[in-house]
Protein backbone atom coordinates (compact mmCIF):
# COMPACT_ATOMS: atom_id res chain seq x y z
CA UNK A 1 0.00 0.00 0.00
CA UNK A 2 1.45 3.36 -0.98
CA UNK A 3 2.00 6.13 1.52
CA UNK A 4 -0.65 8.34 -0.15
CA UNK A 5 -3.36 5.67 -0.15
CA UNK A 6 -2.51 4.72 3.43
CA UNK A 7 -2.80 8.37 4.50
CA UNK A 8 -6.09 8.74 2.59
CA UNK A 9 -7.48 5.67 4.37
CA UNK A 10 -6.38 7.09 7.73
CA UNK A 11 -7.64 10.64 7.08
CA UNK A 12 -11.06 9.56 5.86
CA UNK A 13 -11.86 7.43 8.91
CA UNK A 14 -14.83 8.77 10.83
CA UNK A 15 -12.89 9.37 14.05
CA UNK A 16 -10.24 11.49 12.34
CA UNK A 17 -12.85 13.64 10.62
CA UNK A 18 -14.77 14.03 13.89
CA UNK A 19 -11.55 15.07 15.61
CA UNK A 20 -10.77 17.63 12.90
CA UNK A 21 -14.24 19.16 13.19
CA UNK A 22 -13.90 19.20 16.98
CA UNK A 23 -10.56 21.00 16.82
CA UNK A 24 -11.92 23.64 14.44
CA UNK A 25 -15.04 24.23 16.54
CA UNK A 26 -12.92 24.21 19.70
CA UNK A 27 -10.71 26.97 18.29
CA UNK A 28 -13.73 29.09 17.48
CA UNK A 29 -15.24 28.35 20.88
CA UNK A 30 -12.03 29.43 22.61
CA UNK A 31 -12.28 32.79 20.82
CA UNK A 32 -15.86 33.18 22.01
CA UNK A 33 -14.83 32.33 25.58
CA UNK A 34 -11.98 34.85 25.46
CA UNK A 35 -14.39 37.55 24.31
CA UNK A 36 -16.87 36.56 27.03
CA UNK A 37 -14.19 36.99 29.69
CA UNK A 38 -12.63 40.19 28.35
CA UNK A 39 -15.75 41.96 27.06
CA UNK A 40 -18.49 40.81 29.44
CA UNK A 41 -17.22 39.29 32.69
CA UNK A 42 -14.21 41.51 33.40
CA UNK A 43 -16.14 44.79 32.95
CA UNK A 44 -18.74 43.49 35.43
CA UNK A 45 -15.97 42.52 37.88
CA UNK A 46 -14.43 45.98 37.43
CA UNK A 47 -17.79 47.65 38.05
CA UNK A 48 -18.39 45.62 41.22
CA UNK A 49 -14.83 46.31 42.42
CA UNK A 50 -15.46 50.03 41.99
CA UNK A 51 -12.92 50.76 39.30
CA UNK A 52 -11.22 49.53 36.21
CA UNK A 53 -9.46 46.22 36.64
CA UNK A 54 -6.93 45.52 33.93
CA UNK A 55 -5.25 42.22 34.65
CA UNK A 56 -2.82 42.80 31.79
CA UNK A 57 -1.15 45.55 33.80
CA UNK A 58 -0.68 43.32 36.83
CA UNK A 59 2.93 42.20 36.65
CA UNK A 60 6.14 41.98 38.61
CA UNK A 61 9.35 43.44 37.18
CA UNK A 62 12.19 40.94 37.53
CA UNK A 63 15.06 43.00 36.19
CA UNK A 64 16.43 46.52 35.86
CA UNK A 65 14.26 49.06 34.08
CA UNK A 66 15.98 51.31 31.53
CA UNK A 67 15.57 55.09 31.87
CA UNK A 68 12.52 56.58 30.20
CA UNK A 69 10.57 53.33 29.77
CA UNK A 70 6.88 53.66 30.56
CA UNK A 71 5.87 51.28 33.34
CA UNK A 72 3.30 49.30 31.37
CA UNK A 73 3.52 45.64 30.52
CA UNK A 74 3.76 46.20 26.76
CA UNK A 75 6.44 48.90 27.07
CA UNK A 76 8.53 46.84 29.47
CA UNK A 77 8.32 43.74 27.26
CA UNK A 78 9.27 45.84 24.21
CA UNK A 79 12.30 47.17 26.15
CA UNK A 80 13.37 43.59 26.92
CA UNK A 81 12.79 43.81 30.66
CA UNK A 82 11.99 40.41 32.24
CA UNK A 83 8.43 40.65 33.53
CA UNK A 84 6.35 38.09 35.45
CA UNK A 85 2.89 38.64 33.95
CA UNK A 86 0.67 37.10 36.61
CA UNK A 87 -2.27 39.26 35.50
CA UNK A 88 -2.28 37.69 32.06
CA UNK A 89 -2.13 34.28 33.73
CA UNK A 90 -5.23 35.17 35.79
CA UNK A 91 -7.09 36.09 32.58
CA UNK A 92 -6.06 32.84 30.88
CA UNK A 93 -7.08 30.90 33.99
CA UNK A 94 -10.52 32.53 34.00
CA UNK A 95 -10.88 31.67 30.29
CA UNK A 96 -9.97 28.05 31.03
CA UNK A 97 -12.36 27.72 33.97
CA UNK A 98 -15.26 29.10 31.95
CA UNK A 99 -14.45 26.87 28.99
CA UNK A 100 -14.08 23.80 31.22
CA UNK A 101 -17.40 24.54 32.94
CA UNK A 102 -19.22 24.97 29.62
CA UNK A 103 -17.75 21.73 28.26
CA UNK A 104 -18.69 19.96 31.51
CA UNK A 105 -22.28 21.19 31.14
CA UNK A 106 -22.38 20.06 27.49
CA UNK A 107 -21.11 16.57 28.39
CA UNK A 108 -23.62 16.39 31.23
CA UNK A 109 -26.44 17.31 28.82
CA UNK A 110 -25.32 14.70 26.26
CA UNK A 111 -25.15 12.03 28.98
CA UNK A 112 -28.65 12.98 30.14
CA UNK A 113 -29.96 12.67 26.56
CA UNK A 114 -28.29 9.26 26.19
CA UNK A 115 -29.89 8.04 29.42
CA UNK A 116 -33.27 9.32 28.23
CA UNK A 117 -32.86 7.34 24.99
CA UNK A 118 -31.99 4.20 26.99
CA UNK A 119 -35.09 4.66 29.14
CA UNK A 120 -37.28 5.05 26.04
CA UNK A 121 -35.83 1.83 24.62
CA UNK A 122 -36.54 -0.01 27.89
CA UNK A 123 -40.10 1.36 28.09
CA UNK A 124 -40.80 0.51 24.45
CA UNK A 125 -40.64 -3.17 25.34
CA UNK A 126 -39.18 -6.08 23.45
CA UNK A 127 -38.30 -5.77 19.78
CA UNK A 128 -40.41 -7.30 17.02
CA UNK A 129 -37.97 -10.18 16.71
CA UNK A 130 -38.28 -11.01 20.41
CA UNK A 131 -42.08 -10.83 20.23
CA UNK A 132 -42.10 -13.09 17.18
CA UNK A 133 -39.83 -15.62 18.90
CA UNK A 134 -42.11 -15.61 21.95
CA UNK A 135 -45.17 -16.26 19.76
CA UNK A 136 -43.39 -19.11 17.98
CA UNK A 137 -42.30 -20.55 21.33
CA UNK A 138 -45.84 -20.32 22.68
CA UNK A 139 -47.29 -22.06 19.61
CA UNK A 140 -44.65 -24.78 19.79
CA UNK A 141 -45.46 -25.19 23.46
CA UNK A 142 -49.17 -25.65 22.62
CA UNK A 143 -48.36 -28.24 19.94
CA UNK A 144 -46.23 -30.30 22.34
CA UNK A 145 -49.00 -30.49 24.95
Curated annotation (Swiss-Prot):
Pfam families with a match to the protein in the record: MscL
Q: Where are the transmembrane segments?
A: 10-30, 41-61, 87-107
Q: How does it sit in the membrane?
A: Multi-pass membrane protein
Q: Which GO terms describe its molecular function?
A: mechanosensitive monoatomic ion channel activity
Nucleus keyword on record: no
KW Transmembrane helix (keyword) present: yes
Q: Record's InterPro entries?
A: Mechanosensitive_channel_CS, MS_channel, MSC/AndL, MscL_channel
Which Gene3D superfamilies does its entry note?
Answer: Large-conductance mechanosensitive channel, MscL, domain 1
- Gene Ontology CC: plasma membrane
What is the first-listed, main subcellular location in coarse terms? Answer: membrane
- Key words of the record: Cell inner membrane, Cell membrane, Ion channel, Ion transport, Membrane, Transmembrane, Transmembrane helix, Transport
Q: Which SUPFAM superfamilies is this protein grouped with?
A: Gated mechanosensitive channel
Query: Where does the record say this protein resides?
Result: Cell inner membrane
Q: Which family does it belong to?
A: Belongs to the MscL family.
The protein's job, in short, is: Channel that opens in response to stretch forces in the membrane lipid bilayer. May participate in the regulation of osmotic pressure changes within the cell.
Subunit structure comment from the entry: Homopentamer.
Q: What is this protein called?
A: Large-conductance mechanosensitive channel
Q: Which organism is it from?
A: Psychrobacter arcticus (strain DSM 17307 / VKM B-2377 / 273-4)
Q: What is the lineage of its organism?
A: Bacteria, Pseudomonadati, Pseudomonadota, Gammaproteobacteria, Moraxellales
Amino acid sequence: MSMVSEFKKFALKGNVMDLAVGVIIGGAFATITKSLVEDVIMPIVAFIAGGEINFKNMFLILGDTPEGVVMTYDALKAAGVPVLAYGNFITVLINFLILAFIIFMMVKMVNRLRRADEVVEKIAGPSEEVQLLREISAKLGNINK
